[in-house]
């Protein structure tokens, strides 16, 4: 089994390299406490394993092929392949590790594709650092690469076999005599089965495990201290992951000269200050506890108070009638990762990009949690599923949440009560317990619950409606109703604001699509003891406006939220809503609706707009949004 041991050695060698890289990173940027160091290494291990598996996989494949092609030439080719391959990767990896270590102290985040934007003028490097320093650094780097490469080249050697190719031959003979009794084809079958198992293990390591989410930067985030999270991230993984996600978004949606686009965008009156009259106040206090429930897919088509089936959501309908109901709110996007950013950061959605999947950009966004944390709130996010899905974990920890809880943080017996994790009913019970615990701390709190049961395959522990899909939404409504009824009996109710809305709309009935604005018409409800009185707000708005509207009511500055508006402010004089999906943009204002089809580059559906004003406005908005997103660093 010499070849097996060789693969284990090479795999462990990559892990050792990444461990040493962490030590170098700490030596330059500061060592954490002993306990924190072990936590960083442990939580960062999945990405280290992933990169080690990526780099070992080609060698695994080459050795497998070597079992079937054993000649003197193949031995020589095997040796050269291994040496060139490892030396090339070591050069790249060591360069990434060293640069990441050095720039972190100045940049405060991991090396990613953003760094490439600073190489437009490489001649400036020696000019700024000096040729002497550059030459010395280059020679030192070459020496390090040569030394580490030599160590890696020694891995195939053993006391009995001197080369990778020779080891293949020896292993074949060993397997031939001991495992297969001289039968050539049985020998090959044994080897193939063994290597298939090894390949499966490498695949699982590359993937990041057997969970629903694949390996991503956010899966190693575990702390409210960003230095600990950044230290856990494998710099090689971070760099190539961001490289795959990187696009030049500044070139997207280029419809106008920048000055004209800015002029049109400014006419839309985004990011205005809150100017509230006494009658504009919705709350009994400026510092309520805040609970935001983001409902999976629960769009207006299935909610009675908007335009849906009144049999499906009686509890939501009742809350809308007794609380504050924003009756003309529209979702910005079509997916959870995008709708989440829209809601919590007041940031627009894009047809071809998920900002949440780009940690280098999502981590610098403003957020409701960050704003409330800055004025003394304790912040917590709860989700019954995999919190690493689409980089949610890194986004929430980076933007102000003290704790981000996912399925692994809840009792094992509850983790499969839904196909996606912990069902909504059980999560509502956990939420109640966490609220009770926060109440004992004596400080204001902001909690967020993202539900999951109202999602395909629509399997829920509830049976009231025959339509399986509608029954899943009825279960969400039932769970929410039980939670509200229970929470209403506690002293905490009086000082709590509860905001309820979905992450995006829903395709129901099945023939509805993005070209029908009813699909993304969503309910937005404010309830709780901190709500002054019931009210219907019929102003056109987006879910991106939740952030500025909430902070405006609380007297907290929201000037960082460039694309969010306070719907209750006297400055909100041009109500409009925008929605995007991969094939187009929708723009809605008091004059009607314009839907721009990106495939045909033409207006697909429109109410009268003789001058094309709405089309011009949505194009200018998207041009501004892309330019802003491209600049996020």
Predicted regions and their residues:
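Transmembrane and membrane-interface helices of multi-pass
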Residues: 2-248
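Exposed alpha-helical structural elements
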Residues: 3, 36, 76, 124, ...
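Residues that form generic nucleotide/phosphate-binding pockets
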Residues: 44, 48, 128, 154-155, ...
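Short alpha-helical linear motifs
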Residues: 63-65, 473, 587
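Membrane-interface soluble catalytic domains
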Residues: 174, 215, 530-633
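Soluble catalytic regions of membrane-associated enzymes that act on cell-envelope
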Residues: 209-562, 571-575, 581-582
């Amino acid at each position: 089994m010499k070849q097996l041991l060789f693969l284990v050695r090479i795999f462990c060698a990559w892990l050792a390299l990444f461990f040493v890289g962490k030590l170098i990173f700490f030596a330059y940027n500061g060592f954490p406490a002993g306990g924190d160091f072990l936590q960083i290494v442990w939580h960062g291990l999945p990405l280290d394993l992933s990169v080690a598996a990526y780099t070992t996989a080609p060698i695994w494949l080459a050795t497998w092929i070597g079992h079937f092609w054993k000649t003197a030439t193949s031995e020589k080719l095997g040796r050269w392949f291994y040496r060139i391959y490892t030396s090339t990767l070591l050069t790249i990896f060591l360069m990434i590790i060293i640069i990441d270590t050095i720039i972190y102290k100045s940049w405060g985040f991991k090396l990613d594709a953003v760094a490439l934007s600073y190489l437009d003028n490489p001649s400036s490097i020696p000019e700024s650092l000096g040729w002497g320093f550059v030459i010395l650094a280059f020679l030192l780097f070459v020496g390090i690469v040569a030394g580490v490469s030599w160590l890696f080249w020694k891995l195939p050697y053993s006391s009995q076999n001197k080369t990778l190719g020779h080891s293949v031959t020896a292993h074949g003979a060993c397997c031939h005599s001991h495992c297969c009794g001289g039968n050539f084809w049985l020998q090959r079958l044994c080897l193939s089965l063994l290597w298939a198992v090894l390949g499966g293990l490498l695949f699982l390591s590359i993937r990041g495990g057997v969970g629903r989410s694949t390996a991503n930067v956010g899966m190693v985030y575990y702390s409210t201290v960003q230095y600990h999270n950044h230290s856990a991230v494998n710099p090689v993984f971070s760099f190539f992951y961001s490289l795959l996600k990187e696009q030049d978004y500044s070139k997207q949606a280029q419809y106008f000269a920048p000055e004209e686009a800015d002029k049109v965008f400014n006419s839309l009156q985004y990011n205005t200050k809150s100017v509230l009259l006494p009658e504009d106040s919705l709350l009994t206090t400026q510092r309520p506890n805040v609970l935001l429930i983001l409902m999976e897919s629960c769009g207006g088509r299935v909610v009675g108070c908007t335009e849906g089936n009144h049999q499906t959501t009686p509890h939501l309908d009742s809350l809308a009638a007794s609380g504050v109901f924003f009756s003309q709110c529209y979702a910005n996007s079509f997916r959870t990762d995008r709708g989440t950013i829209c809601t919590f950061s007041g940031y627009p959605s894009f047809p071809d990009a998920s900002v949440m999947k780009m940690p280098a950009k999502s981590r610098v966004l403003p957020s409701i949690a960050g704003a409330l944390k800055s004025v003394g709130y304790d912040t917590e996010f709860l989700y019954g599923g995999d919190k690493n899905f689409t980089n949610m974990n890194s986004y929430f920890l980076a933007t102000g949440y003290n704790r981000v809880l996912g399925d692994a943080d809840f009792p094992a017996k509850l983790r499969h009560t839904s196909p996606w994790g912990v069902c909504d009913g059980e999560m509502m019970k956990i939420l109640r317990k966490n609220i009770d615990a926060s109440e004992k701390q004596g400080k204001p709190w902001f909690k967020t619950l993202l539900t999951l049961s109202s999602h395909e395959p629509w399997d829920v522990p509830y049976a009231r409606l025959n339509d399986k899909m509608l029954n899943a939404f009825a279960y969400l409504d039932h769970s929410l109703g039980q939670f509200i009824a229970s929470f209403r009996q506690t002293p905490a109710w009086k000082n709590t604001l509860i905001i309820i809305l979905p992450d995006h709309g829903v395709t129901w009935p099945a023939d509805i699509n993005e070209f029908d604005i009813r699909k993304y018409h969503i309910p937005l409800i404010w309830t709780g003891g901190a709500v002054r009185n019931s009210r219907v707000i019929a102003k056109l708005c987006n879910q991106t406006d939740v952030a500025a509207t909430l902070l405006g009511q609380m007297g907290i500055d929201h000037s960082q939220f460039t694309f969010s508006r306070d719907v209750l402010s006297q400055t909100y004089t041009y109500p409009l809503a925008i929605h995007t999906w991969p094939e187009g943009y929708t723009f809605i204002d008091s004059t009607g609706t314009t839907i721009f089809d990106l495939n045909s580059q033409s207006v697909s559906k429109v109410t009268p707009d003789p001058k094309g004003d709405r089309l011009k406005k949505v194009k200018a908005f998207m041009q501004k949004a892309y330019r802003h997103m491209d600049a996020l660093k």
